[in-house]
Amino acid sequence: GITISASVSVEDVFMKPDRQNIFGQGSNGVYEPQSGSSWGPAIAGQTVKNWNNEDEKLTYYDNVKNFFDKGVNITENVSFAQQFGKTAVYASFTRLDDHSKIPGAEYSRTNMMLRASSTFGPDDRWSLDAKVQYILSDATNRPLSGANDNNYFLTMFSMPSTMDITRFQQAVDPATGKMFWWLDGSGLNPYWGADYNTNQDVRNRFIMNGSLKYKFTDWLNAEIKAGSDMYFTEETSKLYAGSPLSTNGRFSFGEKKFYENNFSFMVTAQKDRFLGDFGGTATFGGNMMERK
């Protein structure tokens, strides 16, 4: 029969460390528009000169909430299973699309699989099982962690809470063509990074395996197996000019190829109660693996 299913899930930033929202930008109770600290004067709606020498009211912003999106994950599946005499066939197609809560980060995966198993020959002594699977994955702007400019969580939690991150949604300064950001010469506007500091990896993966088994008697059988796992990955990284990360920008492209082949055989003898209440199992086999 045919089975169709789908699922949708939504993600959000659920837990986050507490932050003080009493004091504004600066240190030692003094407002400093270029400071990265939030120990300036108490936030009371007073008018101050911001980093761009503009008058604004000193207030608190929840930049974590304002910057990160609602992530959506959609999975769709179609499968087919049918018995044809002594042969069973199964096929499936699964598609996953993930739009992350991190702006600019996306992931998709397509998975196709076909499997068939059968028994044949006199007294069904022969049995065959074969499977082929193909997986295509595509990731854009994989999130990074640690102390680096591409970790947007670090940027949001270290940014003074009296600065509004949405002010920098227009990531390119139209006057200069460079990144628009409050820190001159350091740091990364996360909106700019999502569009102009990108990475992508695309992987094509093939998995194939099969086994052939023969039953000599009800207690003796032999089986051979073969399998292969191979994938080809293309990685692309783009950094546009106009940020402190690079004056002229940079581009990189790389390919990775991997495969592993396995071949094995095994002879198994299993007998219950061949000496009174005693039984036993004996196996003999070998495996050869090739990896590159």
Model-inferred region functions:
Residues G1-S5, N73-T75, T94-H99:
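A beta-strand signature from Gram-negative outer-membrane beta-barrel systems
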Residues M208-Y214, S228:
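Alpha-helical support elements that line or immediately flank enzyme active sites
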Residues N73, F84-G85, G121-D123, K215-T217, ...:
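Outer-membrane beta-barrel channels and translocator barrels
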Residues T3-L58, I102-A105, N111, R115-R205, ...:
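Surface-exposed loop/interface segments of Gram-negative outer-membrane beta-barrel transport/assembly proteins
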Residues G1, Y60-F67, G71:
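Periplasmic N-terminal accessory/gating domains of Gram-negative outer-membrane beta-barrel systems
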Residues E76-S79, K178:
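Short, charged beta->alpha transition segments
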Residues P17, G36-S38, N66-K70, F80-F84, ...:
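Outer-membrane beta-barrel initiation region
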